[in-house]
């Protein structure tokens, strides 16, 4: 949940603080370990939002993203649909449907969503959002 006036990405945070991105020190909201430079850039690449608690900022490390995705999938799974059925289910064009990776939480781009449809793979409804596999996690 975005907080007005607070940076939502690591890049925005580094610009606000007027420091290089690799000087940003942000702890994980779950394990409290500081994210590495690679994890900070991955966090922004996944289009995740920083978590603000009062004036303290947190992110989510790679391991906790995977653990969170697995926990949510196991505990809040609603249903699965095959490929293009997602448009009928949502009554919305695929390009307007927000889908995150059910393994790493990355926001899927249009090509990744089309790939799932073209291969007749599954989209999964978890809580109120849709999940699919991103191209990186398909390789695992």
UniProtKB/Swiss-Prot annotation:
A zinc finger (unnamed) spans 28-64, 101-137. Pfam families: E6. It is found in: Host cytoplasm; Host nucleus. One of its GO terms (cellular component) is host cell cytoplasm. Keywords: Activator, DNA-binding, Early protein, Host cytoplasm, Host nucleus, Host-virus interaction, Inhibition of host innate immune response by virus, Metal-binding, Modulation of host cell apoptosis by virus, Transcription, Transcription regulation, Viral immunoevasion, Zinc, Zinc-finger. One of its GO terms (biological process) is symbiont-mediated perturbation of host ubiquitin-like protein modification. InterPro entries: E6 (IPR001334), E6_sf (IPR038575). Belongs to the papillomaviridae E6 protein family. This is Protein E6.
């Amino acid at each position: 949940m975005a907080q007005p006036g607070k940076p939502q990405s690591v890049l925005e945070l580094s610009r606000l603080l007027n420091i290089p991105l690799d000087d940003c020190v942000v702890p994980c909201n779950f394990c409290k370990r500081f994210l590495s430079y690679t994890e900070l850039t991955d966090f922004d690449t996944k289009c995740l939002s920083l978590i603000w608690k009062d004036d303290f900022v947190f992110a989510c490390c790679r391991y906790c993203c995977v653990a969170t995705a697995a926990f949510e999938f196991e505990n809040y799974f609603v249903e699965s649909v095959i490929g293009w059925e997602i448009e009928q289910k949502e009554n919305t064009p695929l390009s307007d449907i927000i889908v995150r990776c059910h393994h790493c939480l990355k926001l899927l781009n249009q090509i990744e969503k089309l790939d799932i449809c073209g291969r007749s793979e599954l989209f999964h409804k978890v809580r109120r959002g849709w999940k699919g596999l991103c191209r990186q996690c398909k390789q695992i």
